[in-house]
Amino acid sequence: LENGNYLLKFKDDCTGKDGVFDPGENAVGLTIEGVGDVNLRMSIYFFEKINAAGIKTHYVSADLNETTMEVLPAKVFGKGLEVICRYKAVGSFYRRYSDYCELGQDLPAYVETTFKNDALGDPLVTKDGLVDLGVMTAEQYDDLKAMTQAITKIVADDLKAKGLDLYDIKFEFGYDAEGNVILIDEIASGNMRVYKDGEYIDPMTLNGLFFA
């Protein structure tokens, strides 16, 4: 755009495997009609709340008719970093650490980071790894972790008010020209694991409940 910002187009592609939607999958595996629109709606809803809370994001504005979002320019960390915040021991966390935890046990807004790399299965990386590899500074990591926990609480509290429980959620962060950490990408049902009365809610059902 002329003002230096970027325009993101929301598509109907989702992560999954063998034609089945799975937010934990690394590869884009299927197309669901209308999912781009609903992902944009949810992203607008949460980005506006997060911005209002004084947390930096790349969100500027959106156009639902065009399914586009105007965003501030941001660089990704390394070749892309995913940040997961977990309230419950489920999914890959449980598979890795099942010797040390019960399925579904509470976690204190546990934050972990993975490199975006489908071929390597999005490998986990520690704070020391990120700093020593020159991906980010220790201060940037501390900001990223605090922001992740604050944003996750905003999302979880909102879902709680709708009778829904957030178990975990995945974000992407980047940084601006001054090196400030900012939330980028989207906040959509496909990036979170949500339960209602102990039952997993698939993302398309969650969209329906969220915008009911």
Predicted regions and their residues:
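Active-site loop/lid in soluble adenylation, ligation, and acyl-transfer enzymes
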Residues: L1-F115
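Short histidine-centered catalytic/ligand-binding loop motif
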Residues: P23-V38, L120-M147
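A short glycine-rich, hydrophobically flanked beta-strand micro-motif that places a catalytic Asp/Glu
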Residues: H58-N65, K160-Y175
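Conserved metal-phosphate-binding beta-hairpin within the catalytic cores
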Residues: C85, L166-E186
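A long amphipathic alpha-helix within ATP-dependent nucleotide-binding catalytic cores
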Residues: M136-Y167
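C-terminal helix-cap and adjacent tail motif
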Residues: I187-A212
